[in-house]
Amino acid sequence: MKNAFFVTASIACGKSTFIEIANSLGFKSISADKIAHKILDENALELEKIFSPFNLKNLLTKEKKIDRKILGEIVFNNKEAKKTLENFTHPKIRAKILEQMQILDKENKAFFVEIPLFFESGAYENLGKVIVIYTPKELSLKRIMQRDKLSLEAAKVRLDSQIDIEEKLKKADFIIKNTNSYVDFRQECVKVIQEISKGKM
């Protein structure tokens, strides 16, 4: 799709912040995470049954929604559980993303699709150009620990579950560095967005 620009990175690199900046400049976006969260909640009871072999306690909240923290703990430490979740959710997420992309592409204006596992999934390649947000591994670990209140070991497990950021950079059409202040990062984002929008407005 000529108007689609995918946004990906490692964990805690600033993908969502980029999307917020793009939205503030008048560009529309799609978030794989938001779609995934909705799918988890809509299928909470079914997922509880699917994950019953893993003996998870309190997978559902009192509101009968998925407790994503509990789910994350098992998924990032159990390859079988991770595969089970991906087999259930990924086709649904992809279908919803493609549906929304087709709608936005008709507007003939650049839009952004935030997909954390863009390269890992291999499900969206050749559908648009790719923006990779770069943060050094050490800084990503620090941010994960602060944001998610995790130990260093737990943060490493989550970061190592994805393709190394250096490998992602090799496949990027655009690279945005997020290594300093928010002001610097925003300037980098705006610069790339303006470059993209020149031929899309």
UniProtKB/Swiss-Prot annotation:
Catalyzes the phosphorylation of the 3'-hydroxyl group of dephosphocoenzyme A to form coenzyme A. Its EC number is 2.7.1.24. It catalyses: 3'-dephospho-CoA + ATP = ADP + CoA + H(+). GO terms for cellular component: cytoplasm. This is Dephospho-CoA kinase. HAMAP family: Dephospho_CoA_kinase (MF_00376). The keyword RNA-binding does not apply. It is found in: Cytoplasm. NCBIfam families: dephospho-CoA kinase. Keywords: ATP-binding, Coenzyme A biosynthesis, Cytoplasm, Kinase, Nucleotide-binding, Transferase. Residues 4-201 form the DPCK domain. The keyword ATP-binding applies. It holds the Pfam family CoaE. Pathway: Cofactor biosynthesis; coenzyme A biosynthesis; CoA from (R)-pantothenate: step 5/5. It comes from the Bacteria. GO terms for molecular function: ATP binding; dephospho-CoA kinase activity. It comes from Campylobacter jejuni (strain RM1221). Belongs to the CoaE family. One of its GO terms (biological process) is coenzyme A biosynthetic process. The lineage of its organism: Bacteria, Pseudomonadati, Campylobacterota, Epsilonproteobacteria, Campylobacterales. ATP binds at residues 12-17.
